[in-house]
Amino acid sequence: SRLPSRMLSRSPGWLRRSAPAAVALLAGLATYAAFPPVNLWWSALIGVGVFMLLIRGRRFWAGTGLGLLYGFGLFTPLLHFTMVGMGNPIGWIALTLFESLYLAVLGGAWSLVSRLPLLQGTARQSRFTRRVPAGAAGVLFFALLWSGIEELRSVWPLGGFPFGRLAFA
């Protein structure tokens, strides 16, 4: 965990285990706030940045689970209009779950990629990577993963569902 050790020793076990889940949900909500009707564009920077830092270096299944929760925090309010249009919550819940699965894949992938030696600054440096700090390389790799997942979400399945791309915020 990333909290100071004296804080962890005083906090109950359930709080230590549930804090990352709450942070993932709140990061998703912060990202949602960048979209209309809230339109706080800068909250996307906070939400996505917290998501990236929260999952960095975690185990695969932890990253996957936190990605799923981040997706719930983002897509539950963002796709609420589908319940209004359908008159029942079934489509809203199904679409929220399906779209959140993409971010679960992103969370799992980022948890693996973020542990690469190149991104931790421990890899043997080539002529190209010598000039790129490990932190900047991490942001670049995360942006590539995020863009890839958004593109996949936009084209698959059945022509995709591009609603909720970060560029729309």
Across the structure, where does each feature detected by a protein language model lie?
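Extreme N-terminal basic, low-complexity initiation segments
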Residues: 1-5
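Membrane-embedded alpha-helical bundles of multi-pass enzymes
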Residues: 6-169
